[in-house]
Amino acid sequence: MAFLALAAASPQAEKAAILSVIHRMEDAWNRGDFRGYMAGFKNPDVVFVSGGKFQQGWQGTLDHYVRDYGGSPERRGKLHFYNMKIDLLAPGAAMLIGEYRLIRGARVTEGVNTRLFKKFHGHWLITMNHVSAYDVTPTATAPEAH
């Protein structure tokens, strides 16, 4: 009887796969593809925490993005994730903490994301997303965010 051994991906490969999810999400947002952005989150089971409260879940969050950021590039803005650090917690589980910047005309928002990733059928998805955000004053800019 032959056995097929599946080699676990290296830690570097797992981290690269997680970063690839984030880069695809950023690209999707910046081209106005909110459903593509949301593809990085576990549907429907993702938990969103922002502004000191739980958000509306996957579909409610998609609806919020379309309503509040859709319609034009100016409303959507340009999103950039940076300074990301990934901790592999266990096989199939990882935590990412990173920063982001969203430029919408004269309004610039920066913040921190804490994201719990789990691997489902070989694909990394965000199962918990916590955001802490603030509006940037015109003179305060993060060098990594440009």
Regions found by a protein language model. Give the residues of each.
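A short, structured loop/turn motif at beta-sheet edges
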Residues: 86-94, 117-123
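Sequence/structural signature of outer-membrane beta-barrel proteins
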Residues: 103-105, 135-136
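A solvent-exposed, acidic/Ser-Thr-rich amphipathic alpha-helical stretch
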Residues: 17-21, 34-92, 101, 107-108
